[in-house]
């Protein structure tokens, strides 16, 4: 029976080893349950042992960058697309044109074309929040429908959002607000929001999990993560902000210098198939799959039902822009937390 490992935390690293035929070193930036489901299913149908580590998008980018001269990773699957685009921009990933590209939605193909085929879209998810209806009722708070509502003084200490340095979800939120409001107004908003934030988490999905457990009133997350908590029976209501919101194109990239390149391409092609993407709802995944023939869960949000901004993936995935926003956030928001 094949085995794989899951390791949590930015310090996790694959043990240096000589790559062997039939091995794949994989970083997974989806929820751990989804990571395990995908790896188990791939191993069941392929003669490949997968060594898997689960890292958030920001952590995955940092790991791949730190190991650029001696890559320990072959393939990075899932996580929001901006860090994947930055990795492509930095030459940390290599081009690959899968024979399945013609099967994908336009938004997934656009991710590939923007990066000169160094990354590709594997799913889409919309930014919003989930709030605990019991906490809101107990405090006499109205349902938060808009970004502006999150500045209500009654929400002091009730909001959680991740740190954009480690979380692709939170970076998407940061870039969304900048595109929606303009940079100066967005940072002014984030400073005011900080008065209501109890914690900047490492993981993008952690805020709504805290809200589900009653440890926070509201988590700013991708809406599919909030749907997952509601489907598990927690008192979570899911909201798409009225002013408009951004979205992610969860992506996949082959690391430049990947030792197990053939295995990486095999996984890459397989995970873009409708068969593989149809496995996602079984793991409680409510993202929108990138293969046009894949069937999304009936609980998944439809992009056409939400007011989306025209998210500029090329600009906000570009190294200079992304680093500027992260540095400013660290100086003005994170340091005051």
What are these regions (language model features)?
Residues 125, 189-194, 200-201, 232-256, ...:
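Periplasmic-binding protein-like
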Residues 21-86:
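Early extracytoplasmic/lumenal segment of secretory-pathway proteins
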Residues 29-36, 72-215:
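Extracytoplasmic ligand-binding site segments that recognize negatively charged/polar headgroups
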Residues 94-103, 119, 148, 218, ...:
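Short beta-strand->loop
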Residues 298-337:
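Extracellular/periplasmic bilobal clamshell ligand-binding domains
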Residues 255-313:
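Mature extracytoplasmic/periplasmic domains
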Residues 130-135, 175, 249-260, 279-280:
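A bilobed periplasmic-binding-protein/Venus flytrap-type ligand-binding module shared by bacterial periplasmic
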